């Protein structure tokens, strides 16, 4: 059984990327193949991705769009608060985290961005229900601030508002970006299209829980946060066609991976083939997991002891990922949301400690 300590590593803080590179495709790409021994590691630029994949392969993107979900405000008493919208639940309602000296009670009015008032409704641990006076998405877009990850040390600016979104983001609802997609620009997508590489999208609204640390040494005791996803029939059809022609299904990002695998696992448990799905998932992928859909994965470099590091270790192999991360640190790759990327190939033999 793997423990939390098995997923720890020392990362020089200067390797945590604080800003995006001027060009999306200028980031580096570490191609990793753990199906051979020793693992094959190839240093590339992300612009070289088309040379790593083949005509007839399918790239699956997450088209969620990051909300300007962060607000500063005050209580009627004048006490300062910070609000992070976690999920829009209705036209005028949302779930949110509230940081305050004292938690507000139901019926409390909060002033946000010195622009409008919201009313606190029922508690849905660990969140509060907020009632907005106008459509949530309109007020969030107009008055909110982009929520950057906790390890990025500057406040969001105009550059972040562009670069912390994918070029294909179209469904507002996330509070964190599906960062593997940040490396794609329109010319690269057009080049892949011209090659005959297929594209499809799903939606998974990334929650703030993606940054939630694992606090138990026995990782089997960790409880994942839940996120909403939508897997459309058009994607299901493209996966079937890709399988029929012998192509690879390539998930762009761990969020795409989690949605695909959650839907496939649910379908298998129900004794039916993969089908269009709208659902919640708290899937927690660790070494020993049997992958059902995804053959290859584009992903960034993840935090020590994180659930996402466990996911990529399950996919490519624990020792393969350890070797890849050692190499990336030695070669001064940039880490986390604004950092560089990896292209991983699935290990067909699940690992157990």
From Swiss-Prot:
GO process terms (BP): queuosine biosynthetic process; tRNA wobble guanine modification
Q: Which reaction does it catalyse?
A: 7-aminomethyl-7-carbaguanosine(34) in tRNA + S-adenosyl-L-methionine = epoxyqueuosine(34) in tRNA + adenine + L-methionine + 2 H(+)
What does the record give under GO molecular function?
Answer: S-adenosylmethionine:tRNA ribosyltransferase-isomerase activity
User: What are the protein's UniProt keywords?
Assistant: Cytoplasm, Queuosine biosynthesis, S-adenosyl-L-methionine, Transferase
Looking up Gene3D superfamilies in the UniProt record yields:
QueA-like
Q: Which PANTHER family match?
A: S-ADENOSYLMETHIONINE:TRNA RIBOSYLTRANSFERASE-ISOMERASE
- Quaternary organization: Monomer.
What name does UniProt use for this protein? S-adenosylmethionine:tRNA ribosyltransferase-isomerase
Q: List the gene name.
A: queA
């Amino acid at each position: 059984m793997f423990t939390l300590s098995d997923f720890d590593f020392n990362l020089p803080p200067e390797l945590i990327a604080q800003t995006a590179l001027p060009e999306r495709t200028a980031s580096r790409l570490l191609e990793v193949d753990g199906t051979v021994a020793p693992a094959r590691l190839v240093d590339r630029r992300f612009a070289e991705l088309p040379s790593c994949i083949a005509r007839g392969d399918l790239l699956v993107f997450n088209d969620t769009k990051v909300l300007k979900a962060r607000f500063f405000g005050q209580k009627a008493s004048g006490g300062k608060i910070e609000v992070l919208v976690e999920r829009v639940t209705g036209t005028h309602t949302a779930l949110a985290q509230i940081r305050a000296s004292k938690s507000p009670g139901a019926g409390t009015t909060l002033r946000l961005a010195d622009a409008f008032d919201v009313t606190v409704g029922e508690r849905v641990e660990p969140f509060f229900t907020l009632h907005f006076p106008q459509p949530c998405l309109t007020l969030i877009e107009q008055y909110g601030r982009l929520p950057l990850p906790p390890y990025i040390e500057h406040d969001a600016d105009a550059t972040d508002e562009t670069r912390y979104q994918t070029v294909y983001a179209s469904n507002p609802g996330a509070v964190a970006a599906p960062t593997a997609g940040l490396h794609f620009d329109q010319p690269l997508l057009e080049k892949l299209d011209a090659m005959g590489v297929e594209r499809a999208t799903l939606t998974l609204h990334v929650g703030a829980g993606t940054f939630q640390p694992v606090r138990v040494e026995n990782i089997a005791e960790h409880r994942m946060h839940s996120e909403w996803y939508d897997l459309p029939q058009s994607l299901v059809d493209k996966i079937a066609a890709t399988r029929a022609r012998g192509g690879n299904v390539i998930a762009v990002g761990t969020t795409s991976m989690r949605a695909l695998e959650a839907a496939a696992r649910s379908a298998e448990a129900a004794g039916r083939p993969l089908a269009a799905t709208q659902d919640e998932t708290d899937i927690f992928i660790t070494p020993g997991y049997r992958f059902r859909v995804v053959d290859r994965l584009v992903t960034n470099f993840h935090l020590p002891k994180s659930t996402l590091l466990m996911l990529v270790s399950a996919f490519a192999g624990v020792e393969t990922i350890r070797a890849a991360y050692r190499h990336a640190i030695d070669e001064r790759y940039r880490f986390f949301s604004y950092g560089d990327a990896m292209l991983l190939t699935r290990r067909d033999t699940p690992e157990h400690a």
